[in-house]
Amino acid sequence: MGSRSSTRIPVPLMLTVRVALALSCVCPTSSLDGRPLAAAGIVVTGDKAVNIYTSSQTGSIIVKLLPNMPKDKEACAKAPLEAYNRTLTTLLTPLGDSIRRIQESVTTSGGGKQGRLIGAIIGGAALGVATAAQITAASALILANQNAANILRLKESIAATNEAVHEVTDGLSQLAVAVGKMQQFVNDQFNKTAQELDCIKITQQVGVELNLYLTELTTVFGPQITSPALTQLTIQALYNLAGGNMDYLLTKLGVGNNQLSSLIGSGLITGNPILYDSQTQLLGIQVTLPSVGNLNNMRATYLETLSVSTTKGFASALVPKVVTQVGSVIEELDTSYCIETDLDLYCTRIVTFPMSPGIYSCLSGNTSACMYSKTEGALTTPYMTLKGSVIANCKMTTCRSADPPGIISQNYGEAVSLIDRQSCNVLSLDGITLRLSGEFDATYQKNISIQDSQVIVTGNLDISTELGNVNNSISNALDKLEESNSKLDKVNVKLTSTSALITYIVLTVISLVCGILSLVLACYLMYKQKAQQKTLLWLGNNTLDQMRATTKM
């Protein structure tokens, strides 16, 4: 029952994992396609699996520091074992005393518990200030007090065994594994061999191995000298103490081989000393490791930007450093709550931010929607390697091909150059020689140009320059306004009074009416004159016809 409860995933974590898994099943995802983005100076450098975790699982390792020798070889190894025992006691007694002081500082009474805890931490660690990590370590130590007491109750049987690793379950609230790195050595060298060894050789072998282990112990507990019992032990330190037997505990706690290397690199597996018994030379360590929920189909995609050439100078794309994609939705991923390893992200919570339509369109492959910020710095990265090939800004640096010999030129208006083994086998960039082995296939877009409208100002110096230009424009406008005001001041104010304006309006209306009447009268006179002309013309024609008729008669 104890081991089962120690490995249970908390309800909030289970709910988060189930919701995320349900979403991932509905919306299968693929990693962001970086092929259309590379020529625009946006490089997809890799993906990592996203996991959510909580540090909820604990188990105990009981390190058996003093090995049991075979009966027929005890006399030969007596001298080095006694010296080793004395050194162990000298080295670890301060640690044991500190553990006991902290555990005994908390009584069963209710009042002032936190104050006594802080006081014990400061007194035990000989520090002026108790850090949050030390308080956490001391709290874990106090919570493990009962388990440590149960282990001490079994110390005689643990010390008497000749097994290098075995599980201890009697009366313990959590999984405990007793391991003995030195016992493993004794078993391998003396108990499982039929070869007869002389006493001198036994003494030498035991002495050398014990000295090596003492060196490892000193390395592991070096930080404990300045802050006894309050410094966490790393997974590497735990392996030094327990040897390969550490895997037994991790396997029992549910850590698979496929997760082990990634978890070791994350630093999430830690240990805290909870007991030291100088009589039996037993060292108890409580191991804390995370409960991990794998979010299927959720991956973090890492983006890097390259300085590209534009008509406004060199510029870098404005895109998030890390994005995650589920289905057709792409959002920025906040990794401040995550611990990174080579292949995984372990996050206590998943926090994403929506992106603007422009950035979303850009990362979807529409490079004309990408926005860029001017980067005039001489140290801005002008090239980047990608899958055995190189993406370089050959206007910012000289791209020299050594095989075949020549200079790789970048076309006018082209943002960057995509260089692979088809165009160059050996490339030299700023004195760095690279042998290319990859190829950019036809799916990679090339010859992308950045328009002026895509380059904006974001840097502090550039913004200051633009503000200066705006201030100059405002000053010029103020000068024009002042000139206009001076001209207005010359205008007679009396002529612009209300009564004068009314008079001007009335006179204007009268003038317009008179003009219209004059126009109508002129039109009437013209019409009347034309009518008279037509009448006279008709009379003349009629008289002429009568005269012609009379002449004929």
Swiss-Prot record:
Sequence intervals crossing the membrane: 501-521
Glycan attachment points: 85, 191, 366, 447, 471
Region feature Fusion peptide, mapped onto this chain: 117-141
Compartments where found: Virion membrane; Host cell membrane
Lipidation (S-palmitoyl cysteine): 523
Cytoplasmic side: 522-553
Single biological process term from Gene Ontology: symbiont entry into host cell
GO cellular component term, pick one: membrane
Gene3D superfamilies: 1.10.287.2480, 6.10.10.110, Head and neck region of the ectodomain of NDV fusion glycoprotein, Newcastle disease virus like domain
Disulfide links within the chain: 76-199, 338-347, 362-370, 394-399
Role noted for this protein: Class I viral fusion protein. Under the current model, the protein has at least 3 conformational states: pre-fusion native state, pre-hairpin intermediate state, and post-fusion hairpin state. During viral and plasma cell membrane fusion, the heptad repeat (HR) regions assume a trimer-of-hairpins structure, positioning the fusion peptide in close proximity to the C-terminal region of the ectodomain. The formation of this structure appears to drive apposition and subsequent fusion of viral and plasma cell membranes.
Record note on quaternary structure: Homotrimer of disulfide-linked F1-F2.
Assigned protein family: Belongs to the paramyxoviruses fusion glycoprotein family.
Protein name (record): Fusion glycoprotein F0
Lineage: Viruses, Riboviria, Orthornavirae, Negarnaviricota, Haploviricotina
Gene name for this UniProt entry: F
